[in-house]
A protein has these predicted regions:
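Short hydrophobic beta-strand element within catalytic cores of glycosyltransferases
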Residues: 379-382
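Short alpha-helical donor nucleotide-sugar binding micro-motif in glycosyltransferases
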Residues: 341-342, 349-354
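A conserved catalytic-core segment of Leloir-type glycosyltransferases
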Residues: 6, 42-127
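Nucleotide-activated donor-binding/catalytic signature segment of Leloir-type glycosyltransferases, i.e.
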Residues: 313, 321-345
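Membrane-proximal helix-turn-helix segments that form the acceptor-binding/catalytic region
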Residues: 175-196
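Aromatic "clamp/platform" in nucleotide-sugar-dependent glycosyltransferases that forms part
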Residues: 362
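Carbohydrate-associated surface elements
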Residues: 202, 224
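Conserved acidic donor-binding segment of nucleotide-sugar-dependent glycosyltransferases
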Residues: 394-395, 399-406, 415-420
Length: 461
């Protein structure tokens, strides 16, 4: 029997950023799983209202109790971070982007961010919650300390905060004037959390070194997948790729709108001849898309059959370093396709129309798209480092190569394409492995147990 709302424990989840990347997917999935575990969940989150509906928190979180902070007007402000409400800053340094990197944000703007989110937390009655679950280390942590100092805080590291701290420790760029202040804040916020969720053993080790945290306060909880949606299925592959690349394209180039990169119908012949190699993710520097395109270009002549490489993702207008379209033009790579940013709900069908999920990232914090692709029966090709090195078993569920090794990556691509029986064998093993360890219902139950242990309460029944 369902418990009445008043008797169910309540957690307020906070996400400073508007929904676009992996941490938003994790927030939504955990919130849904916690509701199934008998918890009331309220989400506070930045939001954008754009024609594309990308970044819209209400659309993204669906039926969940979400309190969006509409930052749309801030995009037109002289300084978007000083608007009311402000656009959240970023962990990434993308020149010209409206959401500039945290380490360039001065103290006055920081105070404005904290005051804004303190107001948001008050309106969400955070001080009456049983727990606060704050994703990343951001001004939300400072706001929570002001509004709900007696409420236990569970922090959640997603990895981008660790990348920022590593850059600061190695010597930040000259324009990161406030890097030291932000590093101190992040360490202070981490120390104030009663528990810290980390998705992998690698991240736990890095978090200890960068934040000085006690591992006894950490909960290792990987990211997962929804077994009700991510599974093997049959799709009309040619129809799907026709829709994504020809009929309704969303690929884009620097300074251009989604749909500006489109392909003629005749290219679809490539998709009928051999395996489809799929990358899913953002166009950030750590993903090493330039390396992937170069390695693919090197490997292509050794393929026994045509094997198109599809780059699915790249939040519109956001990229670091060389844009993939520029890399394609520079290298002369053929058979590489930009499919644009697609809703998470479309991924199961896209995985079903593909044969291998590829992630060349050298500092991938976890590798959510690997798990989701593997759940759909795709073997993975990734780098033997960080999260992917823990998810993929080389020789069993996929292929692992050394970081930043173009030759090794090219050789692995050739092996993937030319050995169909091995590809199928590893894909079957991949699906079995992730279904055992990474389903969201199972992970949500583990998180609920961690909550209840922190509060000293028996499990919700």
């Amino acid at each position: 029997m369902d418990l009445p709302a008043l008797s169910r424990p309540r957690v307020v989840m906070g996400l400073l950023f508007f929904p676009r990347g992996g941490s938003a997917q994790v927030t939504r999935a955990l919130a849904q799983a916690l509701v199934e575990q008998g918890w009331q969940v309220t989400i506070v989150c930045s939001s954008l209202r754009l024609p594309s509906r990308l970044g819209d928190a209400r659309t993204f979180f669906g039926d969940l109790d979400v309190r969006p902070v509409d930052c749309t007007a801030a995009l037109q402000a002289a300084d978007p971070l000083c608007a009311d409400p402000p656009l959240p800053p970023s962990y990434e340094d993308r020149p010209g982007a409206p959401d500039r990197v945290l380490a360039t944000v001065d103290n006055a703007t920081y105070e404005h961010l904290v005051a804004t989110w303190a107001r948001v937390l008050r309106e969400a009655c955070a001080d009456q919650a049983d727990l606060l679950h704050l994703h990343h280390l951001t001004p939300l942590n400072a706001a929570a300390a002001r509004v709900a100092p007696e409420v236990p805080v569970v922090g959640h590291l997603h990895g981008t905060e660790l990348l920022l701290l590593e850059t600061i420790e190695q010597g930040p760029p000259a324009h990161w004037v406030y890097a030291g202040a932000w590093a101190q804040r992040m360490r202070r916020w981490a120390a104030a959390c009663q528990r810290l969720v980390v998705p992998s053993a690698t991240q736990l080790t890095r978090a200890q070194a960068l934040l000085g945290i006690d591992p006894a306060r950490c909960v290792q909880l990987p990211n997962g997948f929804d077994p009700r949606r991510f599974e093997r299925r049959s799709v009309d592959r040619m129809a799907l790729w026709h829709r994504l690349l020809v009929e309704r394209p969303l690929g884009w180039g620097p300074g251009r709108e989604p749909g500006s990169v489109r392909y003629p119908p005749h290219v679809l012949g490539l998709f009928a001849q051999g395996p489809v190699l799929l990358y899913v993710g953002r166009f950030s520097a750590v993903k090493r898309l330039d390396l992937l395109i170069s390695a693919y270009n090197r490997a292509r002549e050794a393929f026994a059959v045509s094997a198109p490489l599809v780059l699915l993702g790249g939040f519109p207008g956001e990229w670091e370093g060389e844009h993939p379209l520029e890399t394609i033009q520079r290298t002369g790579a053929r058979d590489v396709f930009l499919a644009g940013w697609h809703d998470h709900d479309e991924l199961p069908e896209i995985f079903a129309a593909s044969d291998v999920v590829v992630l060349p990232s050298v500092r991938e914090q976890f590798g959510l798209m690997l798990v989701e692709g593997m759940a759909c029966g795709l073997p993975a090709l990734a780098v033997k480092a960080s999260g992917p090195g823990e998810i993929v078993t080389d020789g069993q569920t996929g292929w692992l190569v050394p970081p930043d090794d173009e030759r090794a990556l090219a050789a692995a691509l050739v092996a993937v394409v030319n050995d169909a029986p091995e590809r199928h064998r590893r894909g079957t093993a991949a699906a079995a492995a992730v279904h055992t360890h990474y389903s969201w219902p199972m992970l949500g139950a583990r998180l609920a147990c961690a909550y209840e242990a922190l509060l000293g309460r028996p499990p919700v029944t």
